[in-house]
């Protein structure tokens, strides 16, 4: 299996910040300025006070956010203060997904790497990663052509040669400073004691190339030439785009070029499955455009509760309920998005649970679900449900054959979610993914989210669902909803 991963690959500098530390940072900033910026968040970082205000805002509200650092002086401040004492790891959805896939057995993974520096390349897995223009350049043998990257090949001399090839300097490296904070920690906001209501993170992003969705020319050439051999494409990084750039260009041109690129791949390979992963958008206009334009050509879309709430004008469910991770609100919102915009699959991943809505792949089963929802009310003993309501049909209303068939589909999806949850839990707990056996063993050490289990019961009631294994499923229209609690350490 060959998988393309685009577009954002970067370096994450992860630091857990305490209430004491944010209190000290606040003391060094002007009170009125910080309070004004907390009241009206600027959404970007042009000064140290912008950074402190953004961090304090997220810690105060227990929310997550990602703001772009647009001044070099702030980048130097963050790097000098936090980089050496932080956990340095692979960042960017494309980079993280590339490593995960390679470690789980995908034969070839092709990431788009904007800045192939020594540090950046060292963060990739030593398994099955193929760098167009670099891997084949380094070795002329069949091993290089196969794209299988063994960790022993990645010595410093070879990495240095790749670095020189792209004239990369460490000052250009895309670094995302990730500040994790803990629920229940406290800090002083100029005399007001704040208790952090929820664990989350604030990200200060220093990334000039990825914020333009830069595509490495070698990656672009390879993807187009080998499109027929590619099984899937995971695309992300759109949340880093700006509405306008200093050179007068805008995000619209970037989206047009990217959409053209993806359509070119699909033209060469109509079986290519594209997964679109959203992110924390600073601009609602960009979020809207990405959802509408790229959702239409994607096989599946992934997002968290914050991103789902951002799209509330498309689904009409109050954002407050979604942000509280209420399963009924999340389920209604995701169903409305899928049904209104004719999407095949959406996956919502929160800290406490994952929830997906999808159309069954088999035409037979799609018809069965449609017929079930169109049955006369006398037969189903229920009134027709308006769009988005919780009046869903359960398997018990079906005949034995149909029930068994659809239950297998729901069960298969829940098993996929279970493995995904296990991977996420194992990675969060250990920082590693070393194959399926490792994932399953690590998952046994984790506990199901208590909040997730509570929301699962509410899901069953709200959607008239059916429990299956550790999860549950329900029907609405042509769609099946599945939900599963996450695993936490």
Identify the role of each PLM range.
Residues 1-488:
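Ribokinase/PfkB-type carbohydrate-kinase core domain
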């Amino acid at each position: 299996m060959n998988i393309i991963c685009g577009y954002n690959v970067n370096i994450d500098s992860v630091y857990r910040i305490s209430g004491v530390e944010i209190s000290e940072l606040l003391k060094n900033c002007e009170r009125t300025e910080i309070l004004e910026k907390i009241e009206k968040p600027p959404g970007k970082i042009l000064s140290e006070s912008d950074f402190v205000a953004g961090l304090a805002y997220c810690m105060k509200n227990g929310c997550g956010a990602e703001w772009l650092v647009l001044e070099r002086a702030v980048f130097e401040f963050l790097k000098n203060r936090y980089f050496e004492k932080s956990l340095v790891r692979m960042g960017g959805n494309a980079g993280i997904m590339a490593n995960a896939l390679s470690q789980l057995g995908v034969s070839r993974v092709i990431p788009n790497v904007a800045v192939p520096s020594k540090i950046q390349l060292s963060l990739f897995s030593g398994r099955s990663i193929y760098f167009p223009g670099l891997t084949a350049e380094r070795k002329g043998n069949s091993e290089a052509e196969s794209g299988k990257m063994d960790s022993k090949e990645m010595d410093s001399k070879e990495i240095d040669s790749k670095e020189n090839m792209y004239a990369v300097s460490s000052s250009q490296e895309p670094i995302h400073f990730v500040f994790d904070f803990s629920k229940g920690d406290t800090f002083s906001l100029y005399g007001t004691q704040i208790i952090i209501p929820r664990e989350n993170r604030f990200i200060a992003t220093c990334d000039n190339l990825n914020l333009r969705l830069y595509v490495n020319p070698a990656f672009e050439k390879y993807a187009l030439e080998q499109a027929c051999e590619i099984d899937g494409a995971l695309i992300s990084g759109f949340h880093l785009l700006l509405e306008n750039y200093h050179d007068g260009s805008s995000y619209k041109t970037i989206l047009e070029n990217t959409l053209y690129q993806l359509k070119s791949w699909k033209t060469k390979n109509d079986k290519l499955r594209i997964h679109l992963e959203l992110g924390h958008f600073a601009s609602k206009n960009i979020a809207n455009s990405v959802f509408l334009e790229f959702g239409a050509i994607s096989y599946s879309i992934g997002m968290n509760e914050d991103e789902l709430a951002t799209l509330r004008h498309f689904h009409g469910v109050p954002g407050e309920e979604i942000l509280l991770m209420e399963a009924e609100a999340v389920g209604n919102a995701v169903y409305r998005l899928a049904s209104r915009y004719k999407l095949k699959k959406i996956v919502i991943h929160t800290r406490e649970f994952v929830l997906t809505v999808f159309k069954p792949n088999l035409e037979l089963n799609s018809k069965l679900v449609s017929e079930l929802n169109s049955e006369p009310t006398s037969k189903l003993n229920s009134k027709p449900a308006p769009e988005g309501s919780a009046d869903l049909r359960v398997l018990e209303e079906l005949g034995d054959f149909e029930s068994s068939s659809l239950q297998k589909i729901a069960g298969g999806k829940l098993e996929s979610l279970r493995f995904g949850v296990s991977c996420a839990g194992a990675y969060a707990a250990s920082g590693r993914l070393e194959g399926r056996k490792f994932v399953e063993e690590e998952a046994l050490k984790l506990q199901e989210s208590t909040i997730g289990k509570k929301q699962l019961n509410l899901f069953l009631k709200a959607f008239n669902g059916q429990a299956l294994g550790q999860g549950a499923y329900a029907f609405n229209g042509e769609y099946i909803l599945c939900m599963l609690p996450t695993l936490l350490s």
